[in-house]
Each structure stands twice: as structure tokens, then as C-alpha cells.
Amino acid sequence: MTKVDDALFEHGASAVAVEQNNGRDNPTKPKDANICRHLKLAAHHIPHHLAVAVQQGKGKSFANLTYQELDFISLNKQSDAIAFALNAYGLTRGMKAVLMVTPSLDFFALTFALFKAGIIPVLVDPGMGIKNLKQCFIEAAPDAFIGIPKAHIARRLLGWGKASVKRLINVDANQSGVTDTLSRLLTGAPSLASMLSFTTKSSSAKLPEQVEYPMALLEHDEMAAILFTSGSTGTPKGVVYSHGMFEAQIQALKQDYGIAHGERDLATFPLFSLFGPALGMTSIVPEMDASKPITANPEFLFAAIEKYQCSNIFVNPALLERLGRAGEQTDSKNQHKLSSVKRVISAGAPATIASIARFSKMLSDGVPVLNSYGATESLPISMIASDELFTTTQVTDNGGGICVGRAIDGVKIEIIAITEADIPEWDNRLCLNAGEIGEIVVTGQMVSQSYYHREKATAASKIWDSERQTFRHRMGDLGYLDDSGRLWMCGRKAHRVDATQGGQFAKRYYSIPCERIFNTHPNVKRSALVGVTVKGQHGVGEIKPLICIELDQSLVCNKSAQLYQELMVIAEQYSQTQGIRRFLIHPDFPVDVRHNAKIFREKLAVWAQSQTKG
């Protein structure tokens, strides 16, 4: 983007920016908080700049991959047309619609159309499992189901949303290779294309093509979407997102991460890719299964970065590792050099120092990998650049936790004592001192206020702050603040192990500090702390810490006894791990379905218990 274009874009947004004061410290709320206003501004000021490019198929060579593209004005017009069609189909403001569409041009246009119409998209992770998906649909009670043919077939077979769904839309885009009639027979739903055609033909004025859709005027705290957590840290819950939350996230990406209009982003996570057009940034979507990033073909991603000269990359730790390994294996003559990239954002779980260092070899000098901390309920919370993170390695390897940086501007982080009890009202006396490990509590405009129809879960994770007139969110993560205000992660509250002796509490173990100590052993790829119950004196059950070990892929351990002995020696050298004397080798750790990076310790705990005798 030229400087003139950028200035015009900023001028067009100035009224909103002044009114909201960057969406942070001014309590005044805009009368129109619909997140789609950013797309309309882009369509007006940079109409023919590329908004979205989606890779089509796998291609015969990486140099000749094809992409479908939309500029900002076309994306805006298509979303307008779809919004008109949704209204004509009986979907109106305040209704809820499940959206199960793979990353595509339709995905972008549909999502913005829903926002424009004030229809609330319900987003779920297909990998969370059949039982969890069905429960999500029961709780959300959607009015409509919008999905690709596979999603509709699953809906019919498994009864998803049967009690509430009254409107169905099939998003095929002729990808299945079947006729519209056959597709409707298989899915039980009319196609999006047929709806658009009908809406256009039924209007002599051809409204969807020639008239701008009257975007719904929404309040700052009005529900914008329901985003279900993946279930990797517990039962999936619907997080209520307001338009104000989305606005705060956009402002954080602009101000704290430095993303500017005219940039191009390699978008590897569907939800984050939607921020591109809202930021005046192009979203480049490579061919990959976003639910299984570890299966992505690195060459597709490298080719997309090269073709579109991407300046930003959003990845999770699993994909960061995969891309870094691929770059490392390339011979020197064909070494990948990502010269256009000026920032990498890693989120979803803490990336390892080794992964970051390996990936950074492909970047130009001084280009940071920005490690972000947050959750579906509140994102982003804090951030640390790779150069600073590298200086914390020794602390992490010695059981000090993982540094996740300082709070994003406008976010307040506090640490409170560990408790399972609900905390209805905030009191500053709850706060622990610097260096004390407790539960992380956050507040800010990107922090959610409730779970959808989950009153108990809301009560367990929200604390009302009467002074700020907002809820603080209990992250369910443990950590501490150092003297300079940096946050250090020590693992999930549910993953701590409170060991007992003689039926009484003996010692508390935290997952990340313990695991990072054992990960320093050269044969250990990663480790996981779990608790097992063993028989103690007089037959009383005792809870003991156990470390599950995943070996480096190049190793086959036929000397486990020797390894365990070496690990016990390591354990006794640190106060955080003293007393750990049980170890088990696991072939392949189960991981979360969304990022393929968070270790599923709950499953490991069940496995470890089955392997434990007495």
C-alpha cells in the first residue's frame, strides 16, 4: 500500500478511532461497533487491493500453484449479496448460525455477511469429537446450519442441531463435482449459489449487485459470535464474543504487533485469517488441514510466502516446528530464505526455544518470532519477542517456568492464590506478590464476560470487579509475575499434582517447571507430569507424581532402567522435582485437536495409572 492509500484509510477510520480511543482506555462506546465496518472502509479506500487468496488444489509443481483471489471491493460486494440472500431466506439479526465451512472465498464472504446482518456465527472445532460436537449444538441451539456437504451429511447422520435448526445452507462451490440437485439430495440443504441466484432474479433492481447492504448497527457489548473452546483443557464451552472484543483484538494487532494496512499474511488458522481483511491486510490461505497442522506440506506454505511476498506469518508451535525442520533439511543451494517476512506470530501453546531458533534461520536478521499467550476467552494477553525469550532459557531449564512476556496494552494481569472455589467479587487483597505462583487472572476489553448457557462454568471462571464494572477472567493457568512485570507460565491449574504422604498433603508439583527440567536430558523429546494413585501404608491410597517420557524420534530405548536412573538423578538436583521417582516411556503423546501442540495430560494420566502397580 502506498503512503497516500494508508493515510486515506486511516482518515476514513478516524471517527471510529477518536470515539473509541483505540478501543482501550476510553469508556465511551461507539454506537456502531459492527466489526464489518473495517471491511467497508477497506473496500472504499483500497478497493482493488488484494483481500484474500486461497490455494486451489495441490498442483503439479510448487512454482505453478493456482489461487482464487478477491480484492476488497469484491469481498465487500459478495458479502453484501450473501447478507441480502440470508435475509431473504429468513435469517435475521440475533439469530444463530453454525458455520462449518473450510477456508475458502465463501468462508470469508459468508462470515462477513453474517456479521453485517447481525446474525451470530457459531464456530466449533470439527476435531473435538462427535459427542462434544453434538453437545455444543445442543447448548448453542442454532437457528441455521451452514456447511460444506461433508458437514451436512454428518449433521443428518448424527442429528446435530435437530431440535433447533430451521434453516440449512450447503456451501459447495462446485467442489464436489455433483449437480446442485444431487447435492441437495445428499445434504438436505439448498446451495448458497442457488440462494444467491434466486435473490438476484427475484429483485428487478438486482439489489445484491448494485445496492450496499444496510449493515446492522450493533452495540459494543452486543453478541458477535459464539466460539467453542477445543476441549483440550476441559469440556468444550461456548465463549460469547462481543463486537467490542473483536475491536480490541484488532487494535492489539495494530498497536502491539505493529501490523499495518497493505501487509500480506500467511493465514494458517481460520479464525485469525478473518482479521486480515478487517486490518486492511491480505490473507493468503495455503492448502492445508487447519485442524491438523502437523500434516501440512511445508512446500505449499513456502510457495505461498514467495508468490505473495507475505510479511506476516501466523503459526502454532507444531507448524513452526514442521516448517523449521523442513527448512533445515533443504540443501544449501535450495535453502529457503523468507526475506519478505518481517514478523512471525506464534500462538496456541508455548513454542520451544529450539523450534524458534531453527525457524529463525530462514528469517532475515532482526525479524522476531512473537510468542503470544492467551486463550479463546481472552486473546491476546501477553507477548514476548524471540530475542528476549532466548535470554530466559536458563531460567526455564532450571524449573522457573516459561516466560510469556508482558501484558498487551490495555490488559491487566494479576496472580491469585490457587483455589477451586468460586470467587464472586474481586478484591485487590486477593493478589499475590511478585514471584509467588498462583492462578492467572486477566481483565481488558478483549476478555470475554461469559460462557453461553454455562452458568456454573461462568461462575467458576469469572470474578465481578465492581470498580471497573466488568468481569475478570480466571485463566485456569498457573504462573507468577517477576519483578519487571513479566508473566511466567507454570502450567494448567488442573495439571498440578498435589502429592500426599500418609493421607496428608506432602508437596505440590507444577507441570511446566518439572517437565522443562527433564526435557534437558538429551534423549528426551518432551515430558508430561501426571499424578497416579498407589497403595501406601495400611492400604491408604497415595497420590504420587509420575513423568511420562516421549523419546527423540531417532532413539529406540532398550535401556529404560538406565534412563530412569539418570532422570531420578536429575530430579534430586532441583527443589521443583525432588521426590519424583516414577517414569514411563510413551510412544507418542496425545495432543489437542486445534493446535496439535498442547499435551493431553488427562489421557496420559489414565494411561499411566493403568501401567502403575502399587
From Swiss-Prot:
Its EC number is 6.1.3.1. CDD domains: FACL_like_1 (cd05910). Involved in olefin biosynthesis. Catalyzes the conversion of 2-alkyl-3-hydroxyalkanoic acids to beta-lactones in the presence of ATP. The S.oneidensis oleABCD genes produce 3,6,9,12,15,19,22,25,28-hentriacontanonaene, which may aid the cells in adapting to a sudden drop in temperature. InterPro entries: AMP-binding_CS (IPR020845), AMP-dep_synth/lig_dom (IPR000873), ANL_N_sf (IPR042099), ATP-dep_AMP-bd_enzyme (IPR050237), OlefBLtnSynShew (IPR054910). It is an enzyme of class 6 (ligase). The keyword ATP-binding applies. The gene is oleC. This is Olefin beta-lactone synthetase. One of its GO terms (molecular function) is ATP binding.
